[in-house]
Amino acid sequence: MKTLKTYKFRLNPNEATLELLKQHGGNGRFLWNQLVSFSKDFNDQKGRFPTQSELQKQIVVLKEENDFLKTSHSQPLQINAKRLNKTNFDSIKPEKIKERKIKLAKAKTPKQKAKALNFGKPKHKSKHDKNDSIFYPQNFKVKKGRIFVAKIGWIPFIKHRDILGVPKTLTINQDGEQWFCSIVCEIKLKQINKKPLSEANIVGIDVGLTTFATMSDGSKIENPRTLRKNLKKLKKEQKRISRRKFIKTEINGNSVKSSSKNRIKQKNKVRRIHRKVKNVRSDFLHKTSHYMIAKYDGVIIETLGIKNMLENGNSNQNRETNDVSWFEFGRKLEYKAKQNEKYFVKIERFFPSTKTCSKCKSIKDMELKDRTYKCPVCGLEINRDHNAAINILEEGIKVLKNTTGTVGINACGQSAVADMVEARKVSKTACAA
């Protein structure tokens, strides 16, 4: 079986190469901004978005008008047409329009309303964001800790691991003052014989904010709270940005405000903190998901309505929810289970894992402050997260038994809603008795 794997390395360019990277990244950003403006004008005049071929023709026109674009390779420039075309048509999908209306209804200030109206639509890029990227679908080489890209040359990178497989695409991206390369390789996985389905070594996982993960066998993994540990320092450095001055210059009779050197330095400090938080979080998720897949033959988790949580929560709760990265944890578990021929199940989000008694299957309502599940029917007292993990395990095993041999390694629970309705009927009957 073949799969794609991405290797990310930090580039170590000299001054001349660094200037070329900035120039090529700036060319791509300039072209994107020009295409966004062209797309908006085109839509205003003709009532539709330009097609990908029409955007590509506009690139030819822009290259004739701006000679500096010819210094960049054509493929990284042409990819802007494909991406803008996708973004345009994604912005008019029914779900995006619905979400835009919801955000507009909640907006109170003119700034919030303007932001809501532009939600999901392509936006102009700023050079001050320092997040330029250059995409190469081909015309690059990887050799002994260096990459070769057309019209730039050889660029050394800090090689911290071997690159396996056949390189397919290359993305060079800027993160503040640093540059990175992401090499997507096609690798052939070793043939692993999938173990027969056995309930003995399958685990159900309930994720949360207080405890990151509670397993059905009673073990727990604490929430590292990566952002909270760096929040005080981050706020301090962000406040310093507001104290740094702008420089006003006159260009063609117009006053233009730009960041001073000290302001740019301070912004880079904030970017470094954000990068550290992101890397620590990613490292934790990789190690935790690897541990789960290595230890167990099967992993069962529930689908969470994270978007609804963020819409209904307060700012502090939303910050914690974003920091814990439940979706990314589930994604890593899923692809690692697939690569290692392990069982993986995501049960329905409406399955009442927390409200259901893991012993008698009766259902009772619970508040968030209730940390112990006390069943009014059978008298069971158990930690609410442990109780939920057991229910997730049992529901996932039902799904596995129904799908193993037909669907394959991964499956999504389809019987959870029907079982939930039936469980409520049983609960009402038991309580009435």
Which sequence ranges carry the predicted segments?
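Substrate-contacting helices/loops that form the catalytic groove of nucleic-acid
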Residues: 42-44, 48-65, 175-330, 402-433
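Short acidic-glycine loop/turn motifs at beta-strand connectors
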Residues: 143, 175, 216-219, 360, ...
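Secondary-structure transition/turn motif
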Residues: 146-156, 183-188, 217-219, 379
